[in-house]
């Protein structure tokens, strides 16, 4: 996946200098290999810390949510953003703002739980904190990435009313109040149309209604 930095420790944690060197080499290689010298946007996982060996590791989002303190979460995200930026990572694949209504879902720990407002507040706080350091926030997975029964990325037949009242609201706040500069589409389909090419979600709602 061009543009995705994946930390490989090779048996030991990498220092900031080693991570930066690896990313710079990747950027140089990709830039030199295309006719327009276009560099990639380096992105990486940063759910509860920048993804390299000596970066700060914070609690999982489900634990952060238990603080009910969006200001503290914004400060945490600011630290994560700094540690991403110093290594050359310019896009963080976080926050996960899928509202969990069935804790059998294996990715529940990555979320802020079952409450719509809490998800929205925490997600927007993460977006603001990351982007203070020039790191693009990526709320995901847009939208309704899990289904009842705990099945990951399964077909969603959720009604539009429930989508708008529950599953879309955290994303809306991430865009309007968090200023999120990117969004990751969900892997599943909604109402028979894959979310990654769902015009109603990506154009009518995300762009036209929310102004993304």
Where are these regions (language model features)?
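Glycoside hydrolase catalytic-domain context in secreted enzymes
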Residues: 1-212
């Amino acid at each position: 996946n061009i543009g995705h930095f994946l930390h490989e420790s090779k048996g030991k944690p990498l220092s900031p200098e080693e991570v930066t060197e690896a990313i710079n080499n990747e950027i140089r290689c990709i830039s030199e290999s295309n006719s327009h010298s276009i560099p990639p946007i380096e992105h990486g996982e940063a759910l509860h810390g920048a993804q390299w060996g000596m970066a700060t590791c914070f609690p999982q989002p489900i634990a952060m949510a238990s603080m009910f303190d969006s200001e503290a979460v914004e400060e945490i995200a600011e630290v994560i953003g700094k540690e991403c930026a110093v290594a050359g990572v310019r896009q963080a694949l976080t926050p996960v703002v899928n509202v969990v209504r069935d804790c059998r879902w294996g990715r529940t720990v990555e979320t802020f739980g079952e409450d719509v407002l809490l998800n929205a507040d925490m997600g927007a706080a993460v977006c603001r904190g990351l982007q203070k350091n020039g790191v693009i926030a990526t709320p995901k997975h847009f939208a309704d990435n899990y289904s009842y029964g705990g099945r990951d990325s399964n077909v969603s037949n959720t009604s539009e009313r429930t989508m708008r009242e529950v599953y879309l609201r955290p994303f809306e706040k991430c865009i309007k109040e968090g200023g999120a500069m990117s969004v990751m589409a969900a892997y599943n389909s909604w109402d028979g149309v894959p979310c990654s090419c769902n015009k109603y979600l990506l154009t009518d709602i995300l762009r036209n209604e929310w102004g993304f």
